[in-house]
Amino acid sequence: MNKSEPHGAQGFDIVINGEDRLFAELEVSAIASAGFYKESYPEDTVQIRARVDNKLRNVLGYARLE
């Protein structure tokens, strides 16, 4: 998924092992989805990227960000 797709520059990408895998329109949804994934697969690297500023944040677990 990239910024030229229908979601445009709004929302949040959920990045798993360096690859954009999921999308959420709301930050709270991105945090919940990424946290659930991280709890299920703790060995994977899970991050949330805000499309507005392209900033990446690491997900440490359910509702926990670095």
What is the role of each PLM region?
Residues M1-D20:
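Short aromatic-glycine-(Arg/Gly/Cys) micro-motifs in beta-strand/loop hairpins
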